[in-house]
């Protein structure tokens, strides 16, 4: 459950290290975002010579949450951190590598590129 002002780790090599959610996209009064949802973020920490800079406003897709994902069979998949992957204007990942596991819930949507780059899909 990601909401406005939530900090997330970045799970790709775009150059950002930490981002803050400034808007949950999809509806005028939408409060929370889960795995697979697109959010508007601002870069709070970045590495030198990265593709994105501190202060930039970008879109991102949530790939891991501490809250977890409830599956149809009743199982719950939780993670130790909240993480996102930075997206460009065409909703394609900015980075060329994904770090850490991602969930199968991304597969049903338009994020097959993230699924193919991820080292582990749960």
Curated annotation (Swiss-Prot):
Similarity comment: family membership: Belongs to the universal ribosomal protein uL14 family.
Ranges in coiled-coil conformation: none
GO molecular function, one term: large ribosomal subunit rRNA binding
GO cellular component annotations of the record: cytosolic large ribosomal subunit
InterPro entries assigned: Ribosomal_uL14, Ribosomal_uL14_bac-type, Ribosomal_uL14_CS, Ribosomal_uL14_sf
Protein name: Large ribosomal subunit protein uL14
Function: Binds to 23S rRNA. Forms part of two intersubunit bridges in the 70S ribosome.
Pfam families reported for this sequence: Ribosomal_L14 (PF00238)
PANTHER family xrefs: 50S/60S RIBOSOMAL PROTEIN L14/L23, LARGE RIBOSOMAL SUBUNIT PROTEIN UL14M
Subunit annotation: Part of the 50S ribosomal subunit. Forms a cluster with proteins L3 and L19. In the 70S ribosome, L14 and L19 interact and together make contacts with the 16S rRNA in bridges B5 and B8.
This protein's record includes keyword rRNA-binding: yes
Entry annotated with the keyword Transferase: no
Native source species: Saccharophagus degradans (strain 2-40 / ATCC 43961 / DSM 17024)
């Amino acid at each position: 459950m990601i909401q406005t002002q939530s900090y997330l780790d970045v799970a790709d090599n775009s150059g950002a290290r930490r981002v803050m959610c400034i808007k949950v996209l999809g509806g005028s009064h939408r409060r929370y975002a889960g795995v697979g949802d697109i959010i508007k973020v601002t870069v709070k920490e970045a590495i030198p010579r990265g593709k994105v800079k501190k202060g930039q406003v970008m879109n991102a897709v949530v790939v891991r949450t501490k809250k977890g994902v409830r599956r149809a069979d009743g199982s719950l998949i939780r993670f130790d951190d909240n993480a996102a992957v930075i997206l460009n204007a065409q909703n394609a990942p900015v980075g060329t590598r994904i770090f850490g596991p991602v969930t199968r819930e991304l597969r049903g949507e338009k994020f097959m590129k993230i699924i193919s780059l991820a080292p582990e899909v749960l």
